[in-house]
Amino acid sequence: MDFAANAYLQTYRTPYKYGAPVLAGSGKPGSFDALAVDAPFVFFHNGQFHMTYIGFDGEGYQTALATSGDLLHWERKGVILSRKTPGAWDSIGAAGVWIILEDNELDTLPRLKKIDGKYWMVYHSYPQTGYEAGPAEIGLAWTEDETLMNWTRLEQPVFSWKDGADWEKGGLYKSCVVTHNNRYYMFYNAKTEGEPWLEQTGAAFSEDLLHWERCPRNPLLPVSPGCWDSIFVSDPWVVHSGNQWLNFYYGFDGRHAQDGLAVSEDLLHWQKCEGPLLSHGQAGELDGTHAHKACVLRHNGVLYHFYCAVRPWQEGDATNCGGEFRCITVAASAPFQ
C-alpha cells in the first residue's frame, strides 16, 4: 500500500510540524520531569483540552496532567500518578498512557467514558530504577474526581508478561483500550528477552477490564525485516474512521523511530501501510532522531498528530536525558496560525 497512490491514506498525513515543544521537561533536580517528558494522551473534558503525559527523573516514570484551550499552549496541573512506597508492584513509578473513551471515532473529539461511575486509566510500571528498566506489567487506576487529579490504583496488575508467549517475555509497554461489540480490546507492545530485543504489538480481550484473554494470533503487528520498522512495532494508538480501524504506531530500524499506520476492518487482521506516516526530521531539528509515540485527533477539520520528538542535546535545552532532548510536540494537516 503506497501513500503516494492512495488518496484515502493521504488524509492522515500531517506535513506541517510545529517545530517547537508544546511540553518539555522542567530540568529541575528532584522534579518528576527533570530529564524528559513523553507519551501524550490528549482528550476533551469539562470544556477544555487535557493531556496526560509521563515524566522521567532518572529513577522512573510518573504521570502528570496539563490543560489547554488551543492544543498548542499547555498549563501544567500536576502529577496524578506518582511513585509509591517500596513494596508495591508499581513502587518505581506509573506510566499512564490511556484513559477509556466514550467512543474511538477519529472525527469526533475524544471524551472520557464513565464505567460504573468511574473513569479508568491504563498504565504500566517497570520493576527496576532507570529508563524503562526491567519487564513492565500493566495496571488500572480509576477516579470519580472530575478534575482528574486524584486517582486510585488497583493493588495488583491486570495484565502481565509472566503468562505470555516468548515474544512478550521481556516485558510489556504501552497499551490502549478500545470498546467494540460490548468487548474491550487492549492493544499493547511487548519485547523479547535479552539484548538486542524486538518489540511487536498484540491484543487481548476482556469483558470486565480485569480478566484478559490473549489473541491466539499474536503478535498481530510483527516487525518487518529489512524495513523501517524492522526492530520495533510499538506504542499502538487505535481509532476508528469511516469503515476502518486505524493503528498509528511507531517503527524503529535501529537508527530512527518514526510513526506509521496500519489499517484493519475487524481489529484482528492488520495491513501496514508502506513507509512512515510521520518521518523524523533533519539533523539538528527538534525530531532529528525520532518522531514517535503518536496521539492523533481531529479538531475543526484539522488533524493533529502529537508525538515525542528526540534529538541530540543542545546548549540551552531544558533537559538532558542521556545526551538527548526529549519533548512533546505536534504536527498538523494544515498550517499553524
Where are these regions (language model features)?
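Surface loop/turn signatures of beta-propeller and other carbohydrate-active proteins
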Residues: M1-F44, L72-L112, T147-T179, L210-H240, ...
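Acidic/polar residues in short coil/turn loops that connect beta-strands
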Residues: D33, N46, D57-G58, D70, ...
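Membrane-spanning beta-strands of outer-membrane beta-barrel proteins
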Residues: L35, I92, A133-A136, G170, ...
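Hydrophobic core segments of beta-strands in well-ordered, beta-rich domains
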Residues: D38-G58, I80, G96-A133, E137-A141, ...
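Short glycine/serine/proline-enriched coil/turn segments at secondary-structure junctions
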Residues: D57-E59, A88-D90, T129-E132, D166-E168, ...
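Beta-propeller blade signature
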Residues: A64-L71, A136-E146, Q200-L209, G260-L267, ...
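Short conserved catalytic/interaction loops centered on acidic-Pro-aromatic/His motifs
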Residues: Q258-D259, K272
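Short proline/glycine-enriched turn/loop segments at secondary-structure junctions
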Residues: E285, G316-C321
